[in-house]
């Protein structure tokens, strides 16, 4: 448990300072902070520029390369004698897939059905087993199983490496291809084979696919000392509305301080993260900004009006499964001294993916920007270090997830399951109790 005197000092610095000065202009753009299987839409616009080059030069170079591609495409189509598909459509799709996949792990060319699934996820419903994944070092890593889903119920854990699907090894895996293999009809079976680094063993999980309906804000409760608690599982279209409603309910019950649990939250929509932060920011105050490849692509995101900013003490719980849009919330709240961060270092995904529908119904997911906290800090590949660090073992984390997902532990599959104390949550409560005492509340 953290030292009380140290926590009070930290919280005094965090919460008892003057709020930052609000900024004046407002900018709003639908964007996406993508984590693995979570996706959404944005409109991306680019200005082609080269230092000192004529304005027509980029088009000339593009056309030259297009002619080169056309020449190779025709040669393959007319002369290839192997078994692989060599029609123009197949060759073009393979070329596009390879072109985008080599950029970074988050960019991808999507066929029409993959694009529709991406759309579906942001409506809080899709068919699968309930895992959210990330490509890392040519491996598919499970960021977190979604609470209450087949994967979570079976015991799949954060940081498991997905190595086989239905017995087939994932050779040079891509996220899009992996997700397509995991998805399927409701009620159908799929076996995931994972390697668990913490135990140095491989485990098979036979799972039955089902319709996954995501409740992004859950477990809103008032704990002892009138400290509110709620969990955000991901950031989707309705998260801002659900969060505001949960806050209002807790406040009616006498809320004095708040714990926001972002552990194992893989991210989601940028607009949803902005909506959550805006509950604590004054109108027109900068929450975060994104920066593309040229200076004019900076896009500031400010708090909208229409509601009062909350100024009670806040603690945010994070761990290695906290990624992307969830890191935006943690970073913005910490950067502006509106919250203290408790737990473990976050994942470190600070890139923005734009999802663009193509004319034929297929899609392109492309990394177009990095995001930054109000003071200009990026967490990409760095993560956010908590101010109150408190690590939990993988075994204890798995047990805690069972407790959160299924309060009725009689349905837990593990034999002799015994509830355990959430020490990270207890640490956050200790911190907030200290700041409430320091403020005389």
Give, region by region, the residue ranges found by the protein language model.
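Terminal targeting/pro-maturation regions of precursor/exported proteins
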Residues: 15-107, 140, 431, 435-441
């Amino acid at each position: 448990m953290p030292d009380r005197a140290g926590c009070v000092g930290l919280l005094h610095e965090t919460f008892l300072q003057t709020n930052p000065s609000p900024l004046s202009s407002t900018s709003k753009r639908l964007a996406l902070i993508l984590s693995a299987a979570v996706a959404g839409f944005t409109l991306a616009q680019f200005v082609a520029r080269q230092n000192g080059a004529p304005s027509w030069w980029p088009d000339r170079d593009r056309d030259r390369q297009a002619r080169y591609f056309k020449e190779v495409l025709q040669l393959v189509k007319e002369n290839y004698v192997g078994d692989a598909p060599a029609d123009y459509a197949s060759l073009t799709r393979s070329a596009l897939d390879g072109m985008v996949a080599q950029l970074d792990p988050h960019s991808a060319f999507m066929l029409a059905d993959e694009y529709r699934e991406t759309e579906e996820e942001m409506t809080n419903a899709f068919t699968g087993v309930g895992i959210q994944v990330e490509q890392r070092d040519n491996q598919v890593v499970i960021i977190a199983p979604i609470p209450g889903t087949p994967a979570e119920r079976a015991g799949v854990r954060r940081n498991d490496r997905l190595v086989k699907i239905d017995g087939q090894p994932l050779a040079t895996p891509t996220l899009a291809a992996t997700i397509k293999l995991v998805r399927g009809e409701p009620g159908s079976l799929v076996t995931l084979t994972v390697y668990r680094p913490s135990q140095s063993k491989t485990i098979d999980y036979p799972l039955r696919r089902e319709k996954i309906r995501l409740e992004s804000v859950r477990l809103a409760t008032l704990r002892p000392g009138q400290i509110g608690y709620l969990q955000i599982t991901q950031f989707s279209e309705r998260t801002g509305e659900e969060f505001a409603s949960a806050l209002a309910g807790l406040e009616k019950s006498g809320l004095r301080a708040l714990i926001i649990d972002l552990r194992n939250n893989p991210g989601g929509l940028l607009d949803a993260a902005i909506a959550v932060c805006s509950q604590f920011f004054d109108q027109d105050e900068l929450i975060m900004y994104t920066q593309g490849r040229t200076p004019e692509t900076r896009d500031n995101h400010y708090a909208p009006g229409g509601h009062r900013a909350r100024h009670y003490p806040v603690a945010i719980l994070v761990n290695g499964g906290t990624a992307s849009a969830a890191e935006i919330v943690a970073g913005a709240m910490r950067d502006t001294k509106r919250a203290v961060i408790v737990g473990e270092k976050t994942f470190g995904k600070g890139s923005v993916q734009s999802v663009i529908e193509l004319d034929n119904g297929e899609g392109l997911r492309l990394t177009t920007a990095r995001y930054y906290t109000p003071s200009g800090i990026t967490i990409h590949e760095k993560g956010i270090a908590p101010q109150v660090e408190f690590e939990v073992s993988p075994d204890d984390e798995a047990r805690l997830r069972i407790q959160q997902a299924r309060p009725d532990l009689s349905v837990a599959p593990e034999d002799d399951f015994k509830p355990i104390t959430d020490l990270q949550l207890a640490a956050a409560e200790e911190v907030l109790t200290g700041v409430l005492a320091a403020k005389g509340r």
